[in-house]
């Protein structure tokens, strides 16, 4: 039994000096393998007297158990050390700046359109839509635009055929609405429109919002009040607004609304051509002929209409000086919004 105890102490001492898993396994085989030293001790039991056999068997088993536990503990330490080394190599430095993610956003024209629609919906206006390929009848005739009017010229309008055009405004939606609805009518008609023009302030396709209100006892004062409130709301400031007499075949009287230049606060700059004013929309009282074309009794009802370019308002709101930037898909430009 003393030999077994010495063998155990020797094995444990060797374990304390082990530095790697291979050496650890060699010690395991040396003492606990099929031909290991402690295993061979079990073979001596057969040569002992009967009263000595249990003592030796018990001593060998205790030694083997102690050695196996020590080996298991050492092995666990090695595996933990390997895991820590691996984690250290694969460690992610969370203090570093992350990789930026591309984040989408709405196009500035869409933002402007949503802002316009939100205001008029809050003021009781419905949103109506119509075809972009419009008939000559709805695009011109019903709007009091005679055949000799310049707007019908080939250089101003995209003709599909002799009787159909790419709509030059969304006014046709107003006629279609009056045909199917009776007053009171409150609508806006947003959408794409097309004209033969392309430069720093014009594109062949652009977005427009037109509005129509038809009811009893409607006056130009109602129109002015609505548009004044809208412009102050859109630009989020108390603006000076003026209405200048103008001419549109579908309204009488007609006017154009100017606002105090939002770039220079009316002091005069390149954008407002040093006048201190910016033209933003056209408006007027609906011409009796247009009401008649929409099956509305002009003796009983009056109406006003207005129209504005969405890109124009976007340019003023966001300080953009070239209309073409809206359509170039330049991410450097679009990411600013």
From Swiss-Prot:
<comment type="similarity">
    <text>Belongs to the class-II aminoacyl-tRNA synthetase family. Phe-tRNA synthetase alpha subunit type 1 subfamily.</text>
</comment>
<dbReference type="InterPro" id="IPR002319">
    <property type="entry name" value="Phenylalanyl-tRNA_Synthase"/>
</dbReference>
<dbReference type="InterPro" id="IPR045864">
    <property type="entry name" value="aa-tRNA-synth_II/BPL/LPL"/>
</dbReference>
<keyword id="KW-0067">ATP-binding</keyword>
<comment type="subunit">
    <text>Tetramer of two alpha and two beta subunits.</text>
</comment>
<dbReference type="GO" id="GO:0000049">
    <property type="term" value="F:tRNA binding"/>
</dbReference>
<keyword id="KW-0648">Protein biosynthesis</keyword>
<dbReference type="Pfam" id="PF02912">
    <property type="entry name" value="Phe_tRNA-synt_N"/>
</dbReference>
<protein>
    <recommendedName>
        <fullName>Phenylalanine--tRNA ligase alpha subunit</fullName>
        <ecNumber>6.1.1.20</ecNumber>
    </recommendedName>
</protein>
<keyword id="KW-0547">Nucleotide-binding</keyword>
<dbReference type="GO" id="GO:0005737">
    <property type="term" value="C:cytoplasm"/>
</dbReference>
<dbReference type="InterPro" id="IPR006195">
    <property type="entry name" value="aa-tRNA-synth_II"/>
</dbReference>
<dbReference type="InterPro" id="IPR010978">
    <property type="entry name" value="tRNA-bd_arm"/>
</dbReference>
<dbReference type="InterPro" id="IPR022911">
    <property type="entry name" value="Phe_tRNA_ligase_alpha1_bac"/>
</dbReference>
<keyword id="KW-0460">Magnesium</keyword>
<dbReference type="GO" id="GO:0004826">
    <property type="term" value="F:phenylalanine-tRNA ligase activity"/>
</dbReference>
<keyword id="KW-0030">Aminoacyl-tRNA synthetase</keyword>
<dbReference type="InterPro" id="IPR004529">
    <property type="entry name" value="Phe-tRNA-synth_IIc_asu"/>
</dbReference>
<feature type="binding site">
    <location>
        <position position="252"/>
    </location>
    <ligand>
        <name>Mg(2+)</name>
    </ligand>
</feature>
<keyword id="KW-0479">Metal-binding</keyword>
<dbReference type="GO" id="GO:0005524">
    <property type="term" value="F:ATP binding"/>
</dbReference>
<dbReference type="GO" id="GO:0006432">
    <property type="term" value="P:phenylalanyl-tRNA aminoacylation"/>
</dbReference>
<dbReference type="InterPro" id="IPR004188">
    <property type="entry name" value="Phe-tRNA_ligase_II_N"/>
</dbReference>
<dbReference type="Pfam" id="PF01409">
    <property type="entry name" value="tRNA-synt_2d"/>
</dbReference>
<keyword id="KW-0436">Ligase</keyword>
<dbReference type="GO" id="GO:0000287">
    <property type="term" value="F:magnesium ion binding"/>
</dbReference>
<keyword id="KW-0963">Cytoplasm</keyword>
